[in-house]
Amino acid sequence: MARYRGPVEKLERRLGVSLALKGERRLAGKSALDKRPYAPGQHGQRKTKISEYGLQLREKQKAKFMYGVSEKQFRRLFSEAARREGNTGALLIGLLEQRLDNVVYRMGFATTRRFARQLVTHGHILVNGKKVDIPSYRVTAGEKIEVAEKSKTNPQIVRAIELTNQTGIVAWVDVEKDKKYGIFTRIPEREEVVIPVEERYIVELYSK
């Protein structure tokens, strides 16, 4: 299954949670989910009982859409997490957090992961001083992520950094806002990653 490219606000309403897909609109309380917190369609406001499989599928979809990965990429990451020692669900979230597009978002250089992915693919991001245009590039502890010199005055990047004064920056990156670079200091602990995903259902789904 390819990466989702449809209306993101309709997707959030269908899943019933904010997936951080609309950035500033969500912060301002102007997203479709804020205005209509129920599923789209004629029967969207009806309450329906969801099956165990439905729960498992919903949590997988939430994680996939939030991080902007395809089914193939997601399954590959899950398989890697399952091979490692430790909590498979927590390891999966850690691997997703290491994606370059996600790290760019976490450092506050983009208001959404989708925009962060565009910055990466269009050559606006450097890793350790070299251009990397692969969103799935795995960032490791100690690596320097920087906005390219030509892009440091990009108004969307400047605005995203300004918004971090309101949203804050996660604890596992150190960011020099004025110089527009940051260091990925470590892989976060699961409890540090605040996302509306219950990964145990994902583990159950793929373990069948």
Curated annotation (Swiss-Prot):
* SMART domains xrefs: Ribosomal_S4 (SM01390), S4 (SM00363)
Q: Which CDD domains match?
A: S4
A GO molecular function term, named singly, is: structural constituent of ribosome
Keywords from UniProt, A to Z, are: Ribonucleoprotein, Ribosomal protein, RNA-binding, rRNA-binding
Q: Which cysteines are joined by disulfide bonds?
A: none
Q: Quick check: keyword Ribonucleoprotein in the entry?
A: yes
Per its UniProt record, what Pfam families does this chain match?
A: Ribosomal_S4 (PF00163), S4 (PF01479)
Which GO BP annotation is one of this protein's? ribosomal small subunit biogenesis
Q: Name one GO cellular component term.
A: small ribosomal subunit
Q: Which InterPro entries match?
A: Ribosomal_uS4 (IPR022801), Ribosomal_uS4_bac-type (IPR005709), Ribosomal_uS4_CS (IPR018079), Ribosomal_uS4_N (IPR001912), S4_RNA-bd (IPR002942), S4_RNA-bd_sf (IPR036986)
Domain annotation S4 RNA-binding: ranges: 98-161
Per the record, the coiled-coil ranges are none
The answer to keyword Transport applying to this record is: no
| Stated family | Belongs to the universal ribosomal protein uS4 family.
Summarize the subunit comment.
Answer: Part of the 30S ribosomal subunit. Contacts protein S5. The interaction surface between S4 and S5 is involved in control of translational fidelity.
Summary of the function given for this chain in its UniProt record = One of the primary rRNA binding proteins, it binds directly to 16S rRNA where it nucleates assembly of the body of the 30S subunit. With S5 and S12 plays an important role in translational accuracy.
Q: What name has this protein been given in UniProt? A: Small ribosomal subunit protein uS4
> What organism does this protein naturally occur in?
Campylobacter fetus subsp. fetus (strain 82-40)
